[in-house]
């Protein structure tokens, strides 16, 4: 029996700002829509945001009076529907330009926001898509070209709103993550002390069918809804931005989150092949090989054939799930640190890997809501679970929460649903908000971010589109996405990363991981990156760091300053304290393909370090 794909849709709908089934969150960019959305809650968040933005604007006017702000009313009626496209006559590369000052401690940076569209075109000059973007740029202080970083979320089907409003732009939405606080859903926009604007220019990109990015005829939006065409159009946008802004001599970086990480691997190889040489890439909350995440493989393929690496999935996920159990005091004795406990759990799952084989398929099918797809599910006996208490330090309750026929999110704590993006975020099962969205960590940010966007676009970015709607999350994309890549049904992008490193041995790679991320658990990422150990003589500039927090690590007020510090070192090409390297990563699972070979074509090939 094949599991019903609909049973897996909740799993698939939350991969790096993926879309929950049956839910499209749309923000009106038109003036009336902005007013309506801004009035959706109490005035605390919006008034605080307005005051903050006015203060920034006043400071800028005083310090840079010669800089002229240019607002822009975009007349184009953009559509994000699958079969829609713009006529070439409608395409215009226009933008709003605003000037502000960012301050953090004793550091002050005058910066410019540019919000609008550029046209991605193929090698023959034929337009492919008119793509919306927001760029934050600052003048060089030492005469050398500033780095420029291209930033995007994942999905597939997400705009760049989540990284742009949550991470390292000069302003951010102040969430009380992992709590909801008292002012949900009206969290304020504030000055972001951890912005990277003092380090790099930032260009946030919306892929076609998201934000206000639309294909240009004869293409349609759906033309680019696949692993390979997505990379092509993203590459062509980046090349256009570099050309229009004379940035080809700048250090060029990529920053992707969730599905944005396989996109980054593929995009890095595509850019390097095209002669655009990168300085570095950041992989945040990564899913680099869909086959090694059997829950995704089964859901996307709609087949139990996706269970081939189910044991790798169970073992790769468990350390992250255990960190969440520790947060809820389900680990005894309490861990000395998150790092120490991660090491303990890595040892535990490696030791018990063979034992997990008996339960792995049942576990994967249970997580996607179809435990009986292959008959009666098989799980460890109480005796076996009890024997695992001491080496894992997990309580029996936590072990039963992990190994059972129901998803972990509702099994760990009775009467409580915990988040998938961030396992520390929880709501009682009686909370009415769970009826429309089953992930508390998604609820935490979705409405607050869209509320903030509704005021930020016209007031701070100076951009309005009275005939269009901005689409943060397009639910129709993931259901239509062609995941095939490199001759396989799903993307395994470790070979792409290897290819980029072989073309550019100086390419720096930084992997950022949240201990409490249940969407892309950190140990799974370690094991995939470790496949690079199979390439004799390869010694990449790879660093892997870990932080408290979930999928969107930067929402955590402790993690975000640490991320900023690590990223500042990364941009200096310096060693990051505590980061793992390729040599110190744990060895890859024995049944994984070598780094040079896509998983599906060599699923039984042992991946052994030289």
Predicted regions mapped to residue ranges:
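C-terminal motif of bacterial Sec signal peptides marking the signal peptidase cleavage site
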Residues: 35-39
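Bacterial signal peptide processing site
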Residues: 41-44
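Catalytic-loop region of hydrolases
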Residues: 48-148, 159-161, 166, 584-585, ...
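N-terminal cap/lid subdomain of alpha/beta-hydrolase-fold enzymes
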Residues: 69-83, 125-223, 530
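A catalytic-pocket lid/entrance helix-loop region that shapes and gates access to the active site
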Residues: 170-175, 271-384
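Alpha/beta-hydrolase fold nucleophile elbow
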Residues: 246-259
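Glycine-rich nucleophile elbow surrounding the catalytic serine of serine-hydrolase chemistry
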Residues: 256-269
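C-terminal subdomain of alpha/beta-hydrolase-fold enzymes, centered on the catalytic histidine
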Residues: 285, 289-298, 304-319, 376-591
